[in-house]
Amino acid sequence: MIQHMRRLEVVALAMATLLVGSTALAKSEKVAFKDARLKIEVNDTDGDAGVQVFLDSDPWQWIEITDPNGRRLLRSTTRGSFAKQGGTELFMESGEPSFDEVPLEEFLARFPEGEYDFRGEGNDGEEFFGTATFSHDIPDGPALVGPHEGGALVDPDNAVVEWGPVDPPNGSPIIAYQVLVVLGNTGLPALPKITLDVMMPPTATSLAVPPGFLRRDTLYEWEVLAIEEGGNQTLSSSFFRTAP
C-alpha cells in the first residue's frame, strides 16, 4: 500500500512538473504584432512635422518602442480595470512644433532612420515583438488646384476637389493620395467633426464629393496627403464655402 502511494506521489509530481513547464512555455511564447508602424507627417501648409505610431495586437499589459540606437522612445502600461481588459490597438502622434521652433533638420535628427523595435507583454504572459523601418523619404505637399478659400462658392451637389501629382521622394513611389473634406465645430461633443475620408490611387488628381455630403452655405476644410511607399506623408490644406 505504501509503495502504491509513493508511486502515485511520483506520478502526481511528474504531472505537476509537466503542467508548470507547459505554463511557462505558454507564457514565454513570442507573438508578432499584427501591425507596427512609425511614420512622418509633414504639414506643408502650416509648416510643421510630427511622428505617428500605429500598433495592433492581442490584449497587452505594456508595450514599448526603441530607436535604432537602443534608446526607449515610448512605453505604455495598463493599470486598474484597463489592465484587466488589456490594450489592443494604439495610435499616437507626437507634438508638431513649427519649423520656426524646430527646423526639419533638427526634427529628423531626433528620429534617425533605421529599424525601430516594438516589444510588449500580453495578458497571458506572451511576448509581443515587431519592427518598423523608418525613413526620411518625405514627399512634397500636393499643389491644390481648387477650390480655394475666398474663391467662388461651391455647388454642394457638384463639388470636385483637385490637386497636382507629386514626384517620388528619393525614388520612393507615391502609393496613394488621402483626401479629407471636413466640417468642423458641429457642436456635438460625441461628434465634433464630420469628415469625408477617401484613399485615392496614385494616378488620381481629383475627387468628386458625393452629393448629399455637403451642406449649403457652410465652410469646409479640405486636405490632400501624398503618401510614399514607406508610409511618410505630406499634406496641403485649404477651405471653401458652399453656395446657399
Residue ranges, per PLM feature:
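Short, compositionally biased P/S/T/A/G/V-rich stretches that sit at domain boundaries
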Residues: K27-N43, A132-V166
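Long, polar/Ser/Thr-enriched low-complexity segments
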Residues: K27-V102
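Solvent-exposed loop/turn segments flanking beta-strands in beta-repeat/beta-sandwich domains
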Residues: F54-L74, D167-P192, T218-L219
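Extracellular Ig-like/FN3 beta-sandwich strand-entry sites
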Residues: F111-E115, D217-L219
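Conserved structural position at the C-terminal beta-strand
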Residues: G120-G122, A226
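Extracellular fibronectin type III
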Residues: F128, I227-P244
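Short S/T/G- and acidic-enriched coil/turn segments that sit immediately N-terminal to beta-strands
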Residues: L196-D197, P202-P210
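Beta-strand-rich modules
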Residues: G212-N232
